[in-house]
Amino acid sequence: YEIRLSLVGSEMCIRDSTFTLSNGLRIIHAPNLSKVAYCGFAVDAGTRDEYEQEQGMAHFVEHLIFKGTEKRHAWHILNRMENVGGDLNAYTNKEETVIYSAFLAEHFPRAVELLADIVFHSTFPQHEIDKEVEVIIDEIQSYEDSPSELIFDDFEELIFPNHPLGRNILGKPELLRQFTSRNALEFTARFYKTTNMVFFVQGNIDFKKVIRTVEKAVSDISLSETNRQRIAPFTYIPQTLTINKDTHQAHVMIGSRGYHAYDEKRTGLYLLNNILGGPGMNSRLNLALRERRGLVYNVEANLTSYTDTGVFCIYFGTDTEDVDHCIRLVHKELKKLRDNKLTGAQLTAAKKQIIGQIGVASDNFENNALDMGKAFLHYGKFEGPGEVFKRIEALTAEQLLEIANEMFAEEYLSTLVYS
Protein backbone atom coordinates (compact mmCIF):
# COMPACT_ATOMS: atom_id res chain seq x y z
CA TYR A 1 0.00 0.00 0.00
CA GLU A 2 0.98 3.66 -0.33
CA ILE A 3 1.40 6.11 2.54
CA ARG A 4 1.75 9.83 1.89
CA LEU A 5 3.47 12.14 4.34
CA SER A 6 3.17 15.87 4.86
CA LEU A 7 5.15 18.34 6.95
CA VAL A 8 3.07 20.09 9.60
CA GLY A 9 5.07 22.66 11.57
CA SER A 10 8.34 20.90 12.30
CA GLU A 11 6.89 17.40 12.54
CA MET A 12 6.33 14.78 9.87
CA CYS A 13 2.88 13.19 9.98
CA ILE A 14 0.96 10.61 7.97
CA ARG A 15 -1.63 12.33 5.77
CA ASP A 16 -3.35 9.54 3.91
CA SER A 17 -2.79 5.91 3.01
CA THR A 18 -4.17 3.89 0.13
CA PHE A 19 -4.55 0.21 -0.65
CA THR A 20 -6.27 -1.91 -3.30
CA LEU A 21 -7.84 -5.22 -2.30
CA SER A 22 -7.55 -8.30 -4.51
CA ASN A 23 -11.16 -7.82 -5.64
CA GLY A 24 -10.34 -4.34 -6.97
CA LEU A 25 -11.84 -2.24 -4.17
CA ARG A 26 -9.67 0.80 -3.49
CA ILE A 27 -9.30 2.05 0.08
CA ILE A 28 -8.13 5.45 1.28
CA HIS A 29 -7.59 6.36 4.93
CA ALA A 30 -6.73 9.68 6.58
CA PRO A 31 -5.91 9.53 10.29
CA ASN A 32 -6.81 12.12 12.92
CA LEU A 33 -7.06 12.25 16.70
CA SER A 34 -10.82 12.72 16.91
CA LYS A 35 -12.98 10.24 18.80
CA VAL A 36 -15.46 10.42 15.90
CA ALA A 37 -14.72 8.59 12.65
CA TYR A 38 -16.32 8.53 9.20
CA CYS A 39 -16.30 5.89 6.50
CA GLY A 40 -18.27 4.94 3.45
CA PHE A 41 -18.49 3.92 -0.18
CA ALA A 42 -18.25 6.44 -3.01
CA VAL A 43 -19.77 4.85 -6.13
CA ASP A 44 -19.04 6.15 -9.62
CA ALA A 45 -22.70 6.20 -10.65
CA GLY A 46 -25.15 9.06 -10.72
CA THR A 47 -28.01 10.62 -12.62
CA ARG A 48 -26.12 10.83 -15.90
CA ASP A 49 -25.68 7.03 -15.92
CA GLU A 50 -29.40 6.28 -16.00
CA TYR A 51 -31.22 5.04 -19.07
CA GLU A 52 -33.96 7.30 -20.41
CA GLN A 53 -36.69 5.13 -18.88
CA GLU A 54 -35.04 5.00 -15.45
CA GLN A 55 -34.65 8.70 -14.71
CA GLY A 56 -34.30 9.14 -10.95
CA MET A 57 -33.00 5.59 -10.42
CA ALA A 58 -29.63 6.55 -8.86
CA HIS A 59 -31.37 8.64 -6.20
CA PHE A 60 -34.10 6.02 -5.84
CA VAL A 61 -31.48 3.34 -5.10
CA GLU A 62 -29.82 5.65 -2.56
CA HIS A 63 -33.12 5.84 -0.66
CA LEU A 64 -33.98 2.14 -0.93
CA ILE A 65 -30.52 0.87 -0.04
CA PHE A 66 -31.43 1.27 3.64
CA LYS A 67 -34.65 -0.76 3.34
CA GLY A 68 -33.51 -4.36 3.50
CA THR A 69 -30.73 -6.83 2.70
CA GLU A 70 -30.51 -10.59 2.48
CA LYS A 71 -30.04 -10.77 6.27
CA ARG A 72 -31.51 -7.51 7.61
CA HIS A 73 -34.89 -5.81 7.59
CA ALA A 74 -35.14 -2.01 7.36
CA TRP A 75 -35.63 -1.75 11.12
CA HIS A 76 -32.37 -3.60 11.83
CA ILE A 77 -30.45 -1.37 9.39
CA LEU A 78 -31.93 1.75 10.98
CA ASN A 79 -30.93 0.71 14.49
CA ARG A 80 -27.54 -0.86 13.85
CA MET A 81 -25.60 2.42 14.07
CA GLU A 82 -28.25 4.48 15.89
CA ASN A 83 -28.02 2.13 18.89
CA VAL A 84 -24.38 3.16 19.44
CA GLY A 85 -24.96 6.85 18.75
CA GLY A 86 -23.82 6.78 15.14
CA ASP A 87 -25.75 7.47 11.98
CA LEU A 88 -26.10 6.43 8.36
CA ASN A 89 -26.41 8.89 5.51
CA ALA A 90 -26.18 9.10 1.73
CA TYR A 91 -26.41 11.50 -1.16
CA THR A 92 -26.67 11.33 -4.94
CA ASN A 93 -25.54 13.77 -7.59
CA LYS A 94 -25.04 13.71 -11.35
CA GLU A 95 -21.94 11.49 -11.29
CA GLU A 96 -21.68 9.67 -7.96
CA THR A 97 -23.56 8.16 -5.06
CA VAL A 98 -22.07 8.16 -1.57
CA ILE A 99 -23.24 5.99 1.33
CA TYR A 100 -21.48 6.65 4.62
CA SER A 101 -21.60 6.54 8.41
CA ALA A 102 -20.43 8.67 11.35
CA PHE A 103 -19.64 6.94 14.66
CA LEU A 104 -17.27 6.70 17.59
CA ALA A 105 -14.04 5.16 16.29
CA GLU A 106 -14.45 2.08 18.51
CA HIS A 107 -17.49 1.09 16.41
CA PHE A 108 -15.59 1.04 13.12
CA PRO A 109 -16.04 -2.74 12.49
CA ARG A 110 -19.80 -2.41 13.04
CA ALA A 111 -20.03 0.46 10.52
CA VAL A 112 -17.95 -1.31 7.87
CA GLU A 113 -19.92 -4.55 8.10
CA LEU A 114 -23.24 -2.71 7.83
CA LEU A 115 -22.16 -0.52 4.92
CA ALA A 116 -20.82 -3.52 3.00
CA ASP A 117 -24.08 -5.37 3.62
CA ILE A 118 -26.35 -2.61 2.29
CA VAL A 119 -24.12 -1.72 -0.66
CA PHE A 120 -23.62 -5.27 -1.92
CA HIS A 121 -26.60 -7.22 -0.57
CA SER A 122 -29.63 -4.93 -0.69
CA THR A 123 -32.78 -6.66 -1.91
CA PHE A 124 -35.00 -3.58 -2.44
CA PRO A 125 -38.24 -5.17 -1.11
CA GLN A 126 -41.24 -4.13 -3.18
CA HIS A 127 -43.37 -3.27 -0.13
CA GLU A 128 -40.65 -0.84 0.96
CA ILE A 129 -40.48 0.62 -2.55
CA ASP A 130 -44.21 1.29 -2.54
CA LYS A 131 -43.82 3.36 0.65
CA GLU A 132 -40.56 5.12 -0.20
CA VAL A 133 -41.70 6.25 -3.65
CA GLU A 134 -44.28 8.46 -1.96
CA VAL A 135 -41.53 9.91 0.26
CA ILE A 136 -39.46 10.78 -2.82
CA ILE A 137 -42.48 12.30 -4.57
CA ASP A 138 -43.04 14.48 -1.49
CA GLU A 139 -39.38 15.50 -1.80
CA ILE A 140 -39.95 16.42 -5.46
CA GLN A 141 -43.03 18.48 -4.61
CA SER A 142 -41.17 20.27 -1.82
CA TYR A 143 -38.36 21.02 -4.26
CA GLU A 144 -40.78 22.38 -6.84
CA ASP A 145 -42.15 24.74 -4.18
CA SER A 146 -38.68 26.29 -3.86
CA PRO A 147 -37.89 28.22 -7.07
CA SER A 148 -34.51 29.33 -5.74
CA GLU A 149 -33.47 25.65 -5.76
CA LEU A 150 -35.46 24.43 -8.76
CA ILE A 151 -33.92 27.03 -11.07
CA PHE A 152 -30.48 25.39 -10.72
CA ASP A 153 -31.83 22.15 -12.22
CA ASP A 154 -33.72 23.97 -14.94
CA PHE A 155 -30.57 25.89 -15.82
CA GLU A 156 -28.59 22.69 -16.27
CA GLU A 157 -31.39 21.42 -18.51
CA LEU A 158 -31.02 24.64 -20.51
CA ILE A 159 -27.29 24.22 -21.12
CA PHE A 160 -27.37 20.41 -21.41
CA PRO A 161 -30.57 19.96 -23.47
CA ASN A 162 -31.58 16.35 -24.23
CA HIS A 163 -28.57 15.08 -22.28
CA PRO A 164 -28.44 13.07 -19.02
CA LEU A 165 -26.58 15.91 -17.27
CA GLY A 166 -29.65 18.06 -17.80
CA ARG A 167 -31.91 15.71 -15.85
CA ASN A 168 -33.30 16.35 -12.40
CA ILE A 169 -31.63 14.08 -9.84
CA LEU A 170 -34.95 13.26 -8.14
CA GLY A 171 -36.58 11.92 -11.32
CA LYS A 172 -40.20 12.03 -12.45
CA PRO A 173 -43.17 10.83 -10.34
CA GLU A 174 -44.72 8.91 -13.25
CA LEU A 175 -41.50 6.90 -13.72
CA LEU A 176 -40.82 6.44 -10.01
CA ARG A 177 -44.22 4.81 -9.52
CA GLN A 178 -43.25 2.17 -12.10
CA PHE A 179 -39.93 1.19 -10.48
CA THR A 180 -39.64 -2.34 -9.10
CA SER A 181 -37.17 -4.38 -7.07
CA ARG A 182 -35.87 -5.83 -10.31
CA ASN A 183 -35.17 -2.37 -11.75
CA ALA A 184 -33.13 -1.39 -8.70
CA LEU A 185 -31.20 -4.68 -8.74
CA GLU A 186 -30.41 -4.23 -12.44
CA PHE A 187 -29.05 -0.72 -11.79
CA THR A 188 -26.83 -1.81 -8.90
CA ALA A 189 -25.66 -4.84 -10.89
CA ARG A 190 -24.39 -2.44 -13.57
CA PHE A 191 -22.60 0.01 -11.30
CA TYR A 192 -22.16 -1.20 -7.71
CA LYS A 193 -18.98 -3.11 -8.50
CA THR A 194 -15.70 -3.10 -6.63
CA THR A 195 -13.72 -1.45 -9.43
CA ASN A 196 -16.35 1.28 -9.79
CA MET A 197 -16.18 2.52 -6.21
CA VAL A 198 -13.82 3.40 -3.39
CA PHE A 199 -14.01 2.96 0.37
CA PHE A 200 -12.90 5.98 2.40
CA VAL A 201 -12.08 6.22 6.10
CA GLN A 202 -11.21 9.19 8.25
CA GLY A 203 -10.50 8.68 11.91
CA ASN A 204 -8.18 7.51 14.66
CA ILE A 205 -7.98 3.93 13.38
CA ASP A 206 -4.85 1.97 12.54
CA PHE A 207 -4.52 1.55 8.77
CA LYS A 208 -3.72 -2.16 9.01
CA LYS A 209 -6.95 -2.59 10.97
CA VAL A 210 -8.77 -0.64 8.27
CA ILE A 211 -7.53 -3.04 5.60
CA ARG A 212 -8.31 -6.18 7.62
CA THR A 213 -11.79 -4.98 8.53
CA VAL A 214 -12.80 -3.92 5.04
CA GLU A 215 -11.26 -7.02 3.48
CA LYS A 216 -13.29 -9.25 5.80
CA ALA A 217 -16.52 -7.33 5.13
CA VAL A 218 -16.23 -7.68 1.33
CA SER A 219 -14.54 -11.10 1.20
CA ASP A 220 -17.55 -12.56 -0.62
CA ILE A 221 -17.44 -9.92 -3.38
CA SER A 222 -15.38 -10.85 -6.44
CA LEU A 223 -13.46 -8.66 -8.86
CA SER A 224 -15.76 -7.20 -11.51
CA GLU A 225 -15.56 -4.44 -14.09
CA THR A 226 -18.18 -1.93 -15.20
CA ASN A 227 -18.90 -1.63 -18.90
CA ARG A 228 -20.08 1.94 -18.94
CA GLN A 229 -19.76 4.62 -21.58
CA ARG A 230 -20.96 8.05 -20.61
CA ILE A 231 -22.49 10.18 -23.36
CA ALA A 232 -20.33 13.23 -24.01
CA PRO A 233 -22.13 16.58 -23.76
CA PHE A 234 -23.45 17.89 -27.05
CA THR A 235 -22.26 21.15 -28.60
CA TYR A 236 -23.13 24.09 -26.38
CA ILE A 237 -25.42 26.74 -27.84
CA PRO A 238 -26.18 29.69 -25.52
CA GLN A 239 -29.89 30.06 -24.74
CA THR A 240 -32.18 32.68 -23.20
CA LEU A 241 -35.43 31.48 -21.66
CA THR A 242 -38.15 33.06 -19.53
CA ILE A 243 -40.57 30.82 -17.62
CA ASN A 244 -43.69 32.25 -16.03
CA LYS A 245 -43.93 31.22 -12.38
CA ASP A 246 -46.53 32.15 -9.81
CA THR A 247 -43.99 33.63 -7.38
CA HIS A 248 -43.68 36.98 -5.61
CA GLN A 249 -40.07 37.34 -6.68
CA ALA A 250 -38.25 36.83 -9.95
CA HIS A 251 -35.34 34.36 -10.00
CA VAL A 252 -32.50 34.61 -12.49
CA MET A 253 -29.60 32.40 -13.60
CA ILE A 254 -26.81 33.60 -15.88
CA GLY A 255 -23.96 31.30 -16.86
CA SER A 256 -22.43 28.82 -19.23
CA ARG A 257 -20.58 25.56 -19.42
CA GLY A 258 -17.40 25.55 -17.38
CA TYR A 259 -14.18 23.56 -17.18
CA HIS A 260 -14.18 19.84 -16.46
CA ALA A 261 -12.66 18.36 -13.32
CA TYR A 262 -9.30 17.60 -14.92
CA ASP A 263 -8.78 20.97 -16.62
CA GLU A 264 -5.85 22.93 -15.17
CA LYS A 265 -7.74 26.19 -15.74
CA ARG A 266 -10.41 25.12 -13.26
CA THR A 267 -8.45 26.62 -10.34
CA GLY A 268 -8.36 30.01 -12.05
CA LEU A 269 -12.10 29.93 -12.70
CA TYR A 270 -12.63 28.89 -9.09
CA LEU A 271 -10.82 32.04 -7.94
CA LEU A 272 -12.73 34.28 -10.37
CA ASN A 273 -15.98 32.68 -9.23
CA ASN A 274 -15.11 33.56 -5.64
CA ILE A 275 -14.25 37.14 -6.55
CA LEU A 276 -17.58 37.51 -8.34
CA GLY A 277 -20.03 35.81 -6.02
CA GLY A 278 -18.34 33.71 -3.38
CA PRO A 279 -19.57 33.43 0.23
CA GLY A 280 -17.80 36.64 1.29
CA MET A 281 -20.04 39.67 1.78
CA ASN A 282 -17.41 41.67 -0.12
CA SER A 283 -17.88 39.72 -3.37
CA ARG A 284 -18.24 42.04 -6.36
CA LEU A 285 -21.79 40.99 -7.17
CA ASN A 286 -22.95 41.30 -3.56
CA LEU A 287 -21.49 44.80 -3.36
CA ALA A 288 -22.99 45.86 -6.71
CA LEU A 289 -26.48 44.40 -6.31
CA ARG A 290 -27.14 44.28 -2.58
CA GLU A 291 -24.87 46.57 -0.58
CA ARG A 292 -24.85 49.57 -2.93
CA ARG A 293 -28.35 49.32 -4.42
CA GLY A 294 -30.46 47.02 -2.25
CA LEU A 295 -31.80 45.18 -5.29
CA VAL A 296 -31.41 41.61 -4.02
CA TYR A 297 -31.31 39.64 -0.80
CA ASN A 298 -29.05 36.94 -2.19
CA VAL A 299 -26.67 36.81 -5.14
CA GLU A 300 -24.12 34.05 -5.61
CA ALA A 301 -21.81 32.52 -8.18
CA ASN A 302 -21.36 28.75 -8.37
CA LEU A 303 -19.01 26.38 -10.10
CA THR A 304 -19.58 22.66 -10.69
CA SER A 305 -17.03 20.46 -12.44
CA TYR A 306 -17.99 17.11 -13.94
CA THR A 307 -15.57 14.59 -15.42
CA ASP A 308 -15.93 15.93 -18.96
CA THR A 309 -17.58 19.35 -18.65
CA GLY A 310 -18.69 21.87 -16.05
CA VAL A 311 -21.18 24.58 -15.14
CA PHE A 312 -20.54 28.19 -14.16
CA CYS A 313 -23.59 30.14 -13.03
CA ILE A 314 -24.71 33.27 -11.22
CA TYR A 315 -28.00 33.27 -9.31
CA PHE A 316 -30.03 36.08 -7.80
CA GLY A 317 -33.61 36.78 -6.79
CA THR A 318 -35.14 40.23 -7.15
CA ASP A 319 -38.39 42.13 -7.72
CA THR A 320 -39.79 41.59 -11.21
CA GLU A 321 -39.35 45.24 -12.18
CA ASP A 322 -35.63 45.10 -11.26
CA VAL A 323 -34.69 42.05 -13.34
CA ASP A 324 -33.31 43.92 -16.36
CA HIS A 325 -31.37 46.34 -14.15
CA CYS A 326 -29.78 43.47 -12.20
CA ILE A 327 -28.88 41.57 -15.37
CA ARG A 328 -27.13 44.68 -16.71
CA LEU A 329 -25.19 45.04 -13.46
CA VAL A 330 -24.09 41.39 -13.60
CA HIS A 331 -22.83 41.84 -17.15
CA LYS A 332 -21.06 45.03 -16.09
CA GLU A 333 -19.11 43.14 -13.41
CA LEU A 334 -18.27 40.34 -15.85
CA LYS A 335 -17.03 42.92 -18.36
CA LYS A 336 -14.74 44.46 -15.74
CA LEU A 337 -13.04 41.10 -15.28
CA ARG A 338 -12.75 40.65 -19.06
CA ASP A 339 -11.31 44.12 -19.68
CA ASN A 340 -9.19 44.83 -16.62
CA LYS A 341 -6.36 42.71 -15.31
CA LEU A 342 -6.37 42.38 -11.54
CA THR A 343 -3.82 44.60 -9.82
CA GLY A 344 -1.18 43.01 -7.64
CA ALA A 345 -3.04 44.08 -4.51
CA GLN A 346 -6.38 42.75 -5.80
CA LEU A 347 -4.85 39.40 -6.76
CA THR A 348 -3.10 39.03 -3.41
CA ALA A 349 -6.30 39.88 -1.52
CA ALA A 350 -8.38 37.44 -3.59
CA LYS A 351 -5.90 34.62 -3.00
CA LYS A 352 -5.69 35.33 0.71
CA GLN A 353 -9.48 35.30 1.01
CA ILE A 354 -10.08 32.01 -0.78
CA ILE A 355 -7.19 30.30 1.00
CA GLY A 356 -8.69 31.39 4.32
CA GLN A 357 -12.13 30.14 3.30
CA ILE A 358 -10.73 26.75 2.29
CA GLY A 359 -8.78 26.55 5.53
CA VAL A 360 -11.85 27.24 7.65
CA ALA A 361 -13.97 24.78 5.64
CA SER A 362 -11.32 22.06 6.00
CA ASP A 363 -11.78 22.15 9.78
CA ASN A 364 -14.76 19.82 9.35
CA PHE A 365 -13.96 16.12 9.48
CA GLU A 366 -17.20 15.00 7.84
CA ASN A 367 -16.72 17.31 4.84
CA ASN A 368 -13.08 16.24 4.61
CA ALA A 369 -14.04 12.56 4.56
CA LEU A 370 -16.63 13.09 1.81
CA ASP A 371 -14.26 15.26 -0.24
CA MET A 372 -11.53 12.65 0.14
CA GLY A 373 -13.80 9.85 -1.06
CA LYS A 374 -14.96 11.82 -4.10
CA ALA A 375 -11.43 12.94 -5.01
CA PHE A 376 -9.99 9.42 -4.69
CA LEU A 377 -12.83 8.06 -6.82
CA HIS A 378 -12.20 10.46 -9.70
CA TYR A 379 -8.50 11.39 -9.39
CA GLY A 380 -6.98 8.38 -7.67
CA LYS A 381 -5.59 10.70 -4.98
CA PHE A 382 -6.65 13.34 -2.49
CA GLU A 383 -5.11 16.79 -2.41
CA GLY A 384 -4.80 18.32 1.02
CA PRO A 385 -5.33 22.06 1.54
CA GLY A 386 -1.61 22.71 1.19
CA GLU A 387 -1.50 21.43 -2.39
CA VAL A 388 -4.60 23.43 -3.31
CA PHE A 389 -3.04 26.54 -1.79
CA LYS A 390 0.05 26.10 -3.97
CA ARG A 391 -2.05 25.99 -7.14
CA ILE A 392 -3.92 29.11 -6.07
CA GLU A 393 -0.73 30.98 -5.20
CA ALA A 394 0.72 30.11 -8.63
CA LEU A 395 -2.11 31.85 -10.51
CA THR A 396 -1.23 35.05 -12.36
CA ALA A 397 -3.34 38.05 -13.30
CA GLU A 398 -2.67 37.25 -16.97
CA GLN A 399 -4.09 33.74 -16.58
CA LEU A 400 -7.22 35.06 -14.88
CA LEU A 401 -7.75 37.66 -17.61
CA GLU A 402 -7.52 34.94 -20.26
CA ILE A 403 -10.01 32.74 -18.41
CA ALA A 404 -12.41 35.66 -17.88
CA ASN A 405 -12.42 36.44 -21.60
CA GLU A 406 -13.04 32.79 -22.43
CA MET A 407 -15.77 32.11 -19.86
CA PHE A 408 -17.49 35.47 -19.35
CA ALA A 409 -17.95 36.58 -22.97
CA GLU A 410 -21.50 37.91 -23.21
CA GLU A 411 -22.29 35.91 -26.34
CA TYR A 412 -21.24 32.70 -24.53
CA LEU A 413 -23.67 33.12 -21.63
CA SER A 414 -27.13 31.61 -21.20
CA THR A 415 -29.90 33.25 -19.17
CA LEU A 416 -32.88 31.69 -17.42
CA VAL A 417 -35.54 33.85 -15.77
CA TYR A 418 -38.45 32.82 -13.56
CA SER A 419 -40.92 35.70 -13.60
Where are these regions (language model features)?
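Active-site alpha-helix of zinc metalloproteases
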Residues: S6, Q55, F199
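Charge-rich, well-structured scaffold segments of protease-associated domains
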Residues: T20, H76-T226, A232, T242, ...
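Active-site SXXK
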Residues: G56-T69
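Short pre-active-site segment immediately N-terminal to the catalytic Zn-binding motif
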Residues: V43-E54
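Single conserved hydrophobic/aromatic residue that forms the stacking wall/gate
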Residues: Y1-I14
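Phosphate-proximal small/polar/acidic motifs at interfaces that engage nucleotide phosphates
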Residues: N286
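His/Glu-based metal-binding/catalytic segments typifying zinc-dependent metallopeptidases
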Residues: I28-L33, G40-A42, E225-N282
